[in-house]
Regions:
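Glycine-rich, Arg-bearing micro-motifs that act as flexible, cationic patches
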Residues: 103-121, 242-264, 279
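Intrinsically disordered or low-complexity boundary/linker segments at protein termini
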Residues: 1-15, 124-165, 264-283
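Short secondary-structure boundary segments
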Residues: 38, 104-105, 134-135, 184, ...
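Hydrophobic alpha-helical segments and helix pairs
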Residues: 93-144
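Small/aliphatic-rich secondary-structure junction motif
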Residues: 1-47, 149-194, 205-210
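Ordered, small/hydrophobic-rich secondary-structure cores
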Residues: 2, 21-103, 107
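Structural beta-alpha unit
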Residues: 69-100, 138-140, 209-241, 246-249, ...
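Short, surface-exposed alpha-helical segments at coil->helix boundaries
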Residues: 50, 54-62, 167, 193-204
Length: 283
């Protein structure tokens, strides 16, 4: 597998990239090649006073490259200019990445970028499965909050085609997964022709065949609020969820349950986009 690893060269990015456990988790799910990417915002110029950005970025990426190569990955580096989330998506398509990784928070001293906003924009537009790696928000030397990325997964499903696609990610995530919680939230407006518990049990049976300890949860109420409440309760290392298959413009305007989860989850989030966006099959 091939991954895009987006960094703003902040202390938070240092924490995520230099964490051996996180890198081991990526290796366990099959990642062999990593494309390290940093984006120079369009409004930042090399000639600005006190900013030798190009050289500092190259040094930063080379340091990260050394860490990742030492961990056994093949590594390429990219420095590009533009809007971060757009360029991350563009490079992901160009190199035919299987997933992208981005830190959830991290103020960059180089570009004055808050990577959290990039993560949220990627949640709306990502063209490949996106791992939002949660790092401590307010610390001089931040740490990854839940470093065993895929050890305990929370999978949120509405039994849609896109949720089914997201569940397909277990085909490779299972190699690093020990426990899973499957949650479905029934909303007042929902009219399902199937039995939620029966459907969750079928999914649990599949995971059981892979020796993953699984529990199921059914809630009533607002999907975003209930999923985040379950996340707070069971404390998964990562929440797995599919994004809605709406038009890109509509997603940008309205937001979605998946965006709320990306914004509000305490742990990591793995977001799987619709097939027509991702351009390849997981199942």
């Amino acid at each position: 597998m091939r991954a895009i690893y987006a960094t703003d060269l902040s202390a938070a990015s240092d924490a995520a990239i230099e964490n051996e456990t996180c890198l081991d988790c990526l290796e366990r799910i099959g990642v062999e090649e990593i494309h390290l990417l940093t984006v120079v915002p369009s409004n930042v110029h090399a000639g600005m006073p006190g900013m030798d950005l190009e050289e500092r970025r190259e040094r930063g990426l080379e340091a990260y490259r050394s860490v990742m190569e030492e961990a056994g990955f093949r590594v390429e580096t990219h420095i590009v200019r533009g809007t971060p989330y757009r360029r991350i998506n563009g490079v992901a398509e160009t190199v035919r990445a299987d997933l992208a990784v981005v830190g959830s928070r991290g103020q960059s001293p180089l570009a004055n970028r808050v990577i959290g906003s990039t993560a949220r924009n990627l949640a709306r537009t990502t063209v490949v499965p996106l791992l939002v790696n949660r790092v401590e928000r307010e610390a001089d030397e931040p740490e990854v909050i839940r470093e065993h990325l895929f050890q305990r997964l929370l999978f949120a499903t509405d039994f849609s085609e896109n949720a089914e696609r997201a569940f397909g990610a277990f085909n490779y995530l299972r190699h690093a997964t020990e426990e899973a919680t499957l949650v479905h939230v029934q909303s007042p407006k929902e009219e399902l022709e199937l039995d939620p518990q029966s459907e969750l049990d079928k999914l649990a049976d599949t995971l059981g065949q892979w020796d993953i300890d699984t529990q199921t949860v059914i809630r009533d109420g607002d999907p975003s609020e209930e999923i985040l409440d379950v996340e707070e309760s069971v404390k998964p290392t990562t929440t797995l969820i599919g994004s809605r298959g709406r038009s890109r413009l509509r997603r940008l305007m309205l937001g979605s349950v998946s965006e709320d989860v990306v914004a509000g989850a305490k742990g990591n989030v793995y977001l799987v986009p619709p097939a027509r966006t991702a351009g390849y099959n997981l199942l």
